[in-house]
Amino acid sequence: GIRDCLLSRGLGDVYKRQLQGRGVLVSNEYVAARAEILKSNLERMGVSNAVVLNETPARIAEALPEFFDRVLVDAPCSGEGMFRKEPVAQQQHCEALVKQCAELGAQILDCAAAALAPGGQLVYSTCTFAPEEDEGQVAAFLQRHPEFALADVLGNVDYTFGSAGEENRTGGLSLDVSKVRRIWPCQGGEGHFMARLVKAGTPRTLPPEGEYTPEEQLWLAAAAQAGKKSKGKAAKPAKTADARSTRRADSRACRDAVQGTSRRTRDTGAGEATPAQSLAAWQEFARQYFPALAQRPAVVHGGGVLLSVAFPQTGLHVLRAGVFVGSVQKGRFVPEHHLFTAFGSLCTNCCLLYTSDAAD
């Protein structure tokens, strides 16, 4: 799994390509409003194996000790690299802010270290020039955590970017600054800093694609059991319709889902069907339009159906775990935008969706 303290669109797309549908990408944002934006970004990118949390780093570390194989800490910082783009950042800047951000970054790094599995890798990044948050931060972390070693950010790649760190910015602590990187504004960046740290131990390996470890199978079963206990309204009986009108309705619903223009209640609202009815409706829809997904583990959450990911039930505040594929409305299954961004290439019988309605 990968835990990301703050995920931007670009970072999410990179991890989506690297994971290739395997493992789980856990993305956390402490601010509730930004967490909702994060969830929407992952949906638009079609990430199918993501979990979005709205939690504190300390609670994550406590609930998931040594759980993650990769951790990216895009730390909250004083934002000195944003002075050129955001004048308000310069107006708000002060020494107290730098100190506060350095202390907060240290706390987050300690939590990330506890959540990282043996042999895992931790990447720390900021967009500030302040040495207390950059070279000094990494040097102090290594003193607190001797189980970590500094690795070259560039690794084995055949290209370079930015420049090495600076020895006079370590606060008098020992650090091989040649292994960290800065990207100054004159180098096409915005004052970015990054370092890569490796935890002692043997790295774990992911199971083959489409397979789950025994532990992951237990997590999926627990999620399914929790979904069966969720409350939902009784399903309204569907009106009798011929095959043509049914396909026309499917076409319109799928068109709205593909375009992301649906005004329907999201997965945070109550559904119209019981969990069992919702799952049955999804499976019927999937057999016709997404047969490759019909047997994927699915759960019901907030009245909607999600293709779940293998993630333990920890009591953490989870905004999204998996792909929200749709919900039952007015007695029929209505697909969601996320279904098409994540699995649109798997859709079959498309001619039934796009040719059944002359208006399409």
Residue ranges: model-predicted function:
Residues 1-11, 15, 354-358:
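Single conserved hydrophobic/aromatic residue that forms the stacking wall/gate
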Residues 20, 116-117:
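Helix-to-beta-strand junctions that scaffold the AdoMet/dcAdoMet cofactor pocket
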Residues 32-33, 70-110, 123, 128-135:
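Mobile active-site "lid"/loop adjacent to the S-adenosyl-L-methionine
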Residues 36-63:
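S-adenosyl-L-methionine
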Residues 62-70:
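A short acidic, Gly/Pro-enriched loop at the edge of an enzyme's catalytic core
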Residues 135-156:
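Conserved Class I S-adenosyl-L-methionine
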